[in-house]
Regions:
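Short loop/turn segments immediately following beta-strands, especially the blade-tip
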Residues: 58-64, 110-117, 156-166, 214-223, ...
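A short beta-strand motif characteristic of beta-propeller blades
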Residues: 67-73, 120-125, 176-182, 226-232, ...
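Beta-rich, blade/repeat-based domains predominating
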Residues: 36, 50, 75-86, 128-139, ...
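Short glycine/acidic-enriched loop and turn motifs that connect beta-strands
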Residues: 47-50, 95-101, 150-153, 208-210, ...
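Blade-level signature of beta-propeller repeat domains, shared across WD40, Kelch, NHL, RCC1
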Residues: 357-397
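Blade-loop segments of beta-propeller domains
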Residues: 67-141
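Loop/turn-rich, solvent-exposed surfaces of beta-rich toroidal or solenoidal domains
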Residues: 291-357
């Protein structure tokens, strides 16, 4: 479940300046980290004794090594992050249940120092519903769209020219339920994503077993129900995260029954037509107690799909048929840790970084660009309760 209730109210953001260490990379004794071919890696976490907010590391694309993570911005449970198209601003949900005395989570805005990785807090706005779990910045960089798991709702928060957040411009409350009396008594919007044309928003609602489809207007910051307004998945599946393929396909990972459903996406009308549903576990293996899926992403090449399995503690790899959109199982690769809630694929498509929430580690896996298979690199860093990985191209001063 995404929503971890906090009774604390976030009223201020304390930002810790980041001095990225001029240390040798893990596993690369005596070898300095490159400053010309590296990415800033931002790590969203659940805060507590081991974590205080958003952390930053650097990934050297040549050596595969990560620097020791440093606190970049102190804020409450930034469990999902989104980067502005300019790469100059970062936005984080605060997965809390009370903001400024109301039943709401919040969204925090930061300015990125592209050289040091330091985050400067800009401002916060309410997510309108409690327990936000996911957010995305629209392709024009004018709005943040947020999904509230605890409240079962979605909202739009406009972005000003200076990167600050304006008061929410749209809010839609989902309604209904599904078959699981523990998890699906009401709506639980778990993610929201936009199509490449910035015209349609897709909200996966675990509580309803639906992917709701909205027409999105970036100029107005508005959401309007599409026709048809949703795609249905199997009862009790629990749709969680959603990934869009450039060829007109889309994929939702279903948390509760550990499957991925592939859709054909009508790029003009926004509608979704189911193509296939396939298990995220090895062939013949069933769902065990404590197992659930989490994240799903398309490889930058469009050739492969990756999904994370918690409990099984693996990344599943599928090959994508470029003509039909159907998936073929390739492998499950252990994440060398416990509970891989989130992961990130670097923009070059060379590495997958798995965030193991319960073992407090981020592990670097190499991607074979021909087969999609994953290989451990031996590089791991420690950070408290990591759950989200985002990349920003580093810029030398």
């Amino acid at each position: 479940m995404a929503f971890h209730h906090s009774t604390s109210t976030v009223s201020t953001l304390l930002v810790a300046g980041v001095t990225l260490l001029s240390v040798t990379a893990f596993g690369q004794a005596g070898r300095s980290v490159s400053t010309s071919a590296d990415m800033l890696v931002y790590l969203g976490t659940y805060t507590g004794e081991k974590s205080k907010g958003v952390y930053v590391s650097r990934l050297d694309l040549a050596s595969r090594a990560l620097t020791r993570p440093e606190l970049a911005g102190e804020t409450a449970s930034p469990s999902f992050l989104a980067v502005h198209p300019s790469q100059n601003f970062l936005y984080a949900i605060n997965e809390i249940g009370n903001f400024q005395g109301k039943a709401s989570g919040s969204v925090s805005a930061f300015r990125i120092d592209r050289n040091t990785g330091q985050l400067t807090a800009l401002n916060q706005q309410p997510s309108v519903g409690p327990g936000p779990a996911h957010l995305v910045v629209d392709k024009a960089g004018r709005n943040v769209l947020v999904a509230n798991y605890g409240g079962g709702s979605v909202a739009v928060v406009p972005i000003g020219p200076d990167g600050t957040l304006k008061p929410p411009s749209a809010f839609i409350q989902h309604s209904g339920s599904s078959v699981d009396l523990q998890r699906q008594k009401g709506p639980h919007a778990h993610s929201i994503n936009l199509d490449p044309a910035n015209r349609f928003a897709y909200a996966a609602d675990l509580g309803l077993d639906k992917v709701l489809v909205y027409r999105f207007d970036a100029d107005k910051g508005s959401l309007v129900a599409n026709d048809p307004p949703f795609a249905q998945v199997a009862a009790g599946a629990g749709p969680r995260h959603f990934a869009i393929h450039p060829n007109g396909f889309a994929y939702v990972i279903n948390e509760m029954n550990m499957t991925v459903t592939a859709f054909r996406r009508d790029v003009e009308r926004g509608s979704l037509t189911e193509l296939q549903t396939i298990s995220t576990l090895p062939p013949g293996q069933g769902v065990s107690p404590g197992f659930s899926t989490a994240d799903v992403q398309v490889h930058p090449s469009g050739r492969f799909l990756y999904g994370s399995n918690r409990g099984h503690d693996s990344i599943v790899v599928f090959a994508i048929d470029q003509n039909s959109g159907r998936l073929t199982y390739v492998e499950n690769r252990p994440t060398q840790g416990s509970t891989p809630r989130g992961f990130g694929i670097d923009p070059s498509g060379s590495y997958l970084l798995a965030a193991n929430q319960r073992s407090d580690s981020v592990v670097v896996l190499r991607i074979d660009k021909q087969t999609g298979r994953l290989t451990p690199t031996g590089h791991t860093i420690e950070v408290g309760a990591p759950v989200c990985v985002k990349f920003v191209e580093r810029r030398n001063r």
